[in-house]
Amino acid sequence: EILQIHGVLPGRKEEGITRLLYENANGIHNRLGGNEKLDKAKDLINELGADVMAYNEHSQNLRHKDNRNGRNQLFRGGEADVRSVVAHNVHEADRIGRVQEGGTGLLMFGPLTEYLDMPGSEKDATGLGRWTTMLLKGGTGVQTRIICGYNPCRSNRQNNGTSYSQQRRYQIWHQQDHTTCPRVKFREDLGKLLKEWRAAGDRLIVCLDANENIYTQALGKLLTDPEGLGRIEAVGRYTGKKIGPTYFRGQLPIDGIWTTPDVTVSNACIMPAGYGIGDHRLFIIDLHTASLVGPGPPRERRAASRRLNTRLPHVVKKYTENLEENLRRHRLIEKLGEAHSGSTDREGVRSKIEKVDENSMQFMKHAEKKCRRLKSGRISFSPE
């Protein structure tokens, strides 16, 4: 099963859909050049048309001098806006090298960034980097929080660099807690926050590497308890079948995405092992954008790349063909002539011409929207 698709591979992303990808990255190098894993990640983001990318275990000490490239810089290269929230364990950053196990991060691309509330987007307050969040705020009061978290894998060794040992040391040194398991602490702290965010009105999407069976163990049960958090395991619910192993050498479903009932899923699947960049399977979830930010007209956007570019002949051709087809189908040239010949008063002529002009503007916008896709991954713009 680990070499098969669970669910149905989504096609080209439709209008009104937000596509979220999630996976355990199993480490990403910080360099821009010669970085095959980063290049593959950008290719996947481009090919799948991702709006949100959730990664855990990026394994970077973000304070190390060699990790000078931020996530926005690493994943920029296309034409869409990029925003990111990334976290790691800051308490041991000065005592280790550029590699640090654990860490979580979220990336957002394109028009959806207009709804991103950066001040409301949070990181793990302990500074351990156990989770990151992005908050979307719509104009109608609807807001959705996306969470990416990593529950540490149990380790019996005391003095090593695993996330479990890092968090154990933090509890002993900073909280004088010598007994609580970091995994229990993760579950308690995240569960408390999820309740608080929900009470504040947030709709929630939770992407986790639970490092335990999400159906039978404590963390998954906490998330889906109908008398408690009441989250929905998105892939299993949508496909009607519980998910199988998510780690390429494992036998259990240890990763998952959970949503609140007011988030509408239009497709959900898990790709085979090896499809993504890490050693866990890649999740692809399509969500109705209106269920994340509410209905209504799009927000005013910052100046960004336009789809219509006259230096690209194939784009101009596609734009012109689409526009001319709509002009013919809706008889706008004939209607313009009728406006002049069929009205006897100036106001009548003006009213009909304005209607024709309004229709032509709509057709021009539609033609531009369909003439090409904006890239959000590694392929830099080139007029060739």
Regions found by a protein language model. Give the residues of each.
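N-terminal, active-site-proximal structural segment of metallo-dependent hydrolase catalytic domains
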Residues: 1-75, 166-171, 175, 210, ...
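Short catalytic/ligand-binding loop motif for oxyanion handling, primarily in non-cytosolic enzymes
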Residues: 29-31, 61-66, 115-116, 154-158, ...
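Active site of divalent-metal-dependent phosphoester/diester hydrolases
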Residues: 80-108, 214-221, 229-266, 275, ...
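Structured beta-strand-rich core segments of catalytic domains in phosphoester-bond hydrolases
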Residues: 59-154, 271-273
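Surface polyanion/phosphate-binding segment centered on an Asp-His-Pro turn
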Residues: 135-174, 263-384
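Eukaryotic beta-rich interaction modules
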Residues: 2-6, 26-41, 84-92, 114-118, ...
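Active-site beta-strand/loop signature of hydrolases that rely on acidic residues for catalysis
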Residues: 20-26, 41-67, 102, 134, ...
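A long, amphipathic alpha-helix that forms part
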Residues: 167-202
